[in-house]
Regions:
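Long, charged, low-complexity, helical-prone intrinsically disordered regions
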Residues: 1-366
Length: 366
């Protein structure tokens, strides 16, 4: 029987913070950070800054500039896969699964539906591949839109966009770059490194291992998340957390590591807080992204930034970058726990650092 590690909540929180590179020792650069975190999530909302850049700044500080991420993508050291920026070498962990799309063995009803829909639109799929072969990389608007069977959509996507998403999952096309906010599409073989695909079972176990290394502590099985799971299967070793029900898996390399915390402002999409259930269980922290709520129903703001202090999440900063006005508007600093004078000063320093990194002046909302 493997050893079951028994952790206090403080132990568990520190493992999570260490894993996410949010402790006192900053990583050596964007690529080492990306390899440890396994991904940087892209999101079109940039109320303060694009989320991937904000996550990198939280780890690297003001030595990081967004051009570093663009350069790494242009040089194919990082690759965009399904709105996640991943180390180029990690793509080999997905290629075998792509080749098996929509899955092996008996398919679920949803898998059959997706397979049949793509087959029904095979003419459009082939036309897209031919256009990319001859002219790529291309933005979506320059690709054929000749789907014979429309995608049943709630308004978030159209047929061509959905077909491109499935073609990504099939390993046929990939994002080759961006022109402004437009993704540029090309044949996957021109974008992905020519590394041998890792067999499916081995690749899933390795992805679980890397995910646990990035999270520090996670459930063996958990709720389903789109694109990137939050659970880790049998990776690591079993653990119990005092005051929290159920079993966890922990990366044993992070146990008994000296912890030196710091204060940090986080993206709402930061992996430390992305799994809201885990955040509540380990940090006893209540958080929701409220930009989709009517203004009158928001508790913390449109794009409130979680505040990490040591191994605790202690508040939220409601801020917005007004780039035309040249200011970072700070609407409120919400204190989940009463701030000491020292903590308040550290939070203000982080806000000042954020404004300086953005090249903006601080403006306090009336």
């Amino acid at each position: 029987m493997p050893q079951i590690h028994r952790l206090s909540r403080a132990d568990a929180r520190r493992v999570a913070v260490l894993a996410q590179l949010l402790h006192g020792e900053r990583p050596g650069g964007l690529l080492p950070a990306a390899r440890r975190l396994t991904l940087l999530q892209l999101d079109p909302v940039s109320a303060v800054a694009p989320s991937a850049d904000l996550v990198a700044w939280s780890r690297l500080g003001s030595s990081y500039v967004p051009g570093h991420l663009r350069a790494a993508l242009d040089e194919r050291r990082l690759i965009e896969l399904r709105a996640m920026v991943r180390p180029a070498e990690d793509i080999a962990l997905y290629r075998a699964e792509m080749a098996e799309w929509p899955g092996r063995g008996e398919l679920t009803e949803w898998q059959r539906h997706r397979r049949d829909w793509v087959l029904a639109n095979d003419r459009c799929r082939r036309e897209i591949l031919a256009r990319l072969r001859d002219e790529g990389p291309l933005p979506s608007r320059r690709l054929p839109d000749t789907c014979d069977r429309p995608w049943s959509s709630t308004g978030w996507t159209d047929s061509k966009t959905q077909l491109l998403e499935f073609m990504v999952q099939r390993g046929e096309v990939a994002v080759a770059g961006r022109a402004g906010r437009d993704r540029l599409w090309d044949l996957a073989g021109r974008v992905y490194p020519d590394h041998p695909p890792v067999p499916t079972g081995e690749a899933r176990r390795e992805r679980d291992r890397r995910r646990l290394r990035a999270l520090g502590l996670a459930r063996p099985r958990g709720p389903e998340f789109p694109v990137e799971p939050a659970d880790v299967g049998e990776a690591g070793e079993p653990a119990l957390v005092e005051g929290v029900r159920g079993e966890w898996r922990v990366d044993p390399a992070l146990l008994d590591v000296p912890f030196h915390g710091r204060t940090a402002l986080l993206s709402p999409f930061d992996r430390l807080v992305h799994d809201r259930t885990r955040t509540q269980e380990l940090f006893e922290y209540d958080y929701q992204l409220e930009m989709y709520k009517p203004a009158a129903k928001r508790r913390w703001g449109y794009y409130a930034l979680p505040v990490l202090h040591g191994d605790r999440l202690v508040g939220k900063v409601d801020a917005r970058a007004d780039r035309k006005g040249g200011v970072l508007v700070v609407n409120a600093v919400h204190q989940d726990v009463p701030f000491t004078a020292d903590l308040a000063a550290e939070v203000e320093r982080e806000i000042a650092d954020l404004a300086g990194w953005l090249g903006l002046e601080i403006c306090r909302a009336a």
